[in-house]
């Protein structure tokens, strides 16, 4: 049984340029920009502040062999949830973000528009549950 990522996503963003064929760093920068990175690409741990929410944006190429299983997806995204959970404060040359600047945390997961298996969907659901236990919101965005 398969389902389209668009059916489980919270939103869809079209950026074109075959973003999913790019290398991971180039793809990450393009997706960061498209999803509203307002802290710069080198800011530690988080990518944007959005109305009091500290947001980390992560892209995951679900067509990669590593992410064929629920365990593969869960293990990768669990590390991202843990990193966001551990985030308290960070600074660069332009700004300092501390707990007074945010009241919630969110991991925004960017995925390609494709069919995924029930196994892959289970991996995403497992991550949502794990994040919920830590008080972190998960949103899934289809980027095409």
Predicted regions and their residues:
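Catalytic toxin/effector domains delivered as secreted proteins or via bacterial secretion systems
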Residues: 3-144
